[in-house]
Amino acid sequence: MIDRYTHQQLRIGLVSPQQISTWSKKILPNGEIVGEVTKPYTFHYKTNKPEKDGLFCERIFGPIKSGICACGNYRVIGDEKEDPQFCEQCGVEFVDSRIRRYQMGYIKLAYPVMHVWYLKRLPSYIVTLLDKPLNELEDLVYCNFYFARPIDKKPTFLRLRGLLEYEIQPWKYRIPIFFTTRSFDTFRNREMSTGGGSIRQQLANLDLRIIIDYSLVEWKELEEEEPTGNEWEDRKVGRRKDFLLRRMELAKHFIRTNIEPKWMVLRLLPVLPPELRPIYHIDEDKLVTSDINEIYRRIIYRNNTLTDLLTTSIATPEELIISQEKLLQEAVDALLDNGICGQPMRDDHNRVYKSLSDVIEGKEGRVRETLLGKRVDYSGRSVIVVGPSLSLHRCGLPREIAIELFQAFVIRDLIRKHLASNIGVAKSQIRKKKPIVWEILQEILDDHPVLLNRAPTLHRLGIQAFLPVLVEGRAICLHPLVCKGFNADFDGDQMAVHVPLSLEAQAEARLLMFSHMNLLSPTIGDPISAPTQDMLSGLYVLTSGNRRGICVNRYNPCNRRNYQNEDNNYKYTKKKEPFFCNPYDAIGAYRQKRINLGSPLWLRWRLDQRVIAAREVPIEIHYESVGTYYEIYGHYLIVRSIKKEILYIYIRTTLGHISLYREIEEAIQGFWQGCCNSMLPTGIRVSPG
């Protein structure tokens, strides 16, 4: 059983048959060893008690009721004076019934069975280690081919090499007909092999260090070769180099973790604890059971049949043995990952059985729903909405959520500042929502980060830290630039908020997890904070004004008709385009509804006049009575004096472009000010302007 205080991490990997046996075996006082499930039965139809050596056996998995054996005898749990700890009649241990949640059993397979996860999943570990095509290994596993060679390194009778197709069997007629079943099994293991046993023997003969050396030599040879110019051949060489790198990494992993490759072929099949695959009695004659129980039953039936064929029968045809081995392999495949090798296993109502992979993986699987999706203290959840006015490292936290998450902090400060005499009075003030409560809460939020997480957390940017800001409503406000890291959008997505309590967690949030410190992708280094969706739409609206030039606007009759159809509130659309001395006047005119975002206007240009090179010929020249004149170009206008000196320069733009320019300018100034302050000594700061 996993103790949360002593076990801080969980690792899923390969285990040896000895370890599986250790998990399951128990030695009774009479010396009998229990743990192996040999019968495909669950409960007796008359007594409703678990069958002995069945899938719910109390001797193997523990008592159904704490301290009560199958005979009905009772012992005090944990009392060392009580003797014996096992019932002498039924062999059930007097322990807590919760042992049935973690006590495992095992099935001793009559023939080695391939673990389908390591064969069919990508990348296939067995294909990588053996360096053979996947279809060839599948034909061996499912007994479509024989692997003919001296596996045991002894003289052979047939002198065959390579793969032999099952249907042809050219060796069949050379075998004397007086071979019995047991003799045939010995002969086959000596001369040739098929099924999971052939894969297991090849994996057992591997030397991982030799694999690393040979793969490294081949990779260096391919690296030294020059490109052939043939795209197909060059890609083939590149794929081979990638395969060799994966093979070396996998071999190093097996060496580093002390895992033997032959463990990927099962000799002992673990049986889950019964509480994890329950069976319920609805009525007297109706049962509801887990699909895993039905698959276990088929495995035991087929395994017992194969055992009988190999041990008891004398003249069983070898085709029948091969067929039964294939059925056993398919049953174990259905338990691990139903449907991965073709047609899934179904029940009598044509419903697909739910395998272990279906229980573990997916959004509703054991990991994501039960473990990662488990509710914890000091956490909340709500829908996210866009917060365009927020800083990149801030998020909007609803008052209702904030006061619940930080209630303990608010109570502490109320008592510390002598605003409440005890916890009860402080909670009363919080329930009444007094103004002092919100002031204290805002002080706490100014210096306490929170963690935002969006499931599924597939990479480290799926959970980031923010400084919260109190907002109205019930939705969490999020800056749109951080959505890409969360893979979130604002169409109803929900996010969870967590409060880091310890100083270590708060320090980690500030130093490593703040959103403005995770601007680049940790995998490829590309910017992860890029404008998407709403921001791109907003930028398009700001810059989609009529910028085609003065000629098109002035002399196109269709454009004049469009002007006449616009809103009457914008008086400049029917007359000439307005002139503004600075951006503030243009913004004021927009707020007074005198212009809109896309209305063309003339804005006085106050920057270096040398940036405008008068290389083009003016479209029009307007002369004033005082002697000044206007040179009108496509996108700008120059006002000159009588002496042809430049008095003013106006650029033709829109209010949307002005707003975008101001935002960019403020961002650059803020960045420059932050860089200067970071380089100056402590206590000296650069003020804006």
Curated annotation (Swiss-Prot):
The keyword Transferase applies. Zn(2+) binds at residues 69, 71, 87, 90. Its EC number is 2.7.7.6. DNA-dependent RNA polymerase catalyzes the transcription of DNA into RNA using the four ribonucleoside triphosphates as substrates. It catalyses: RNA(n) + a ribonucleoside 5'-triphosphate = RNA(n+1) + diphosphate. Its cofactor is Mg(2+); Zn(2+). Belongs to the RNA polymerase beta' chain family. RpoC1 subfamily. One of its GO terms (biological process) is DNA-templated transcription. The keyword DNA-binding does not apply. It is found in: Plastid, Chloroplast. Its main location: plastid. It comes from Lactuca sativa (Garden lettuce). This is DNA-directed RNA polymerase subunit beta'. Mg(2+) binds at residues 489, 491, 493. GO terms for molecular function: DNA binding; DNA-directed RNA polymerase activity; magnesium ion binding; zinc ion binding. It holds the Pfam family RNA_pol_Rpb1_1. InterPro entries: DNA-dir_RpoC_beta_prime, RNA_pol_asu, RNA_pol_N, RNA_pol_Rpb1_1, RNA_pol_Rpb1_3_sf, RNA_pol_Rpb1_clamp_domain, RNApol_RpoC1. In plastids the minimal PEP RNA polymerase catalytic core is composed of four subunits: alpha, beta, beta', and beta''. When a (nuclear-encoded) sigma factor is associated with the core the holoenzyme is formed, which can initiate transcription. GO terms for cellular component: chloroplast; DNA-directed RNA polymerase complex; mitochondrion. Binds 1 Mg(2+) ion per subunit. It comes from the Eukaryota. Keywords: Chloroplast, DNA-directed RNA polymerase, Magnesium, Metal-binding, Nucleotidyltransferase, Plastid, Transcription, Transferase, Zinc. SMART domains: RPOLA_N.
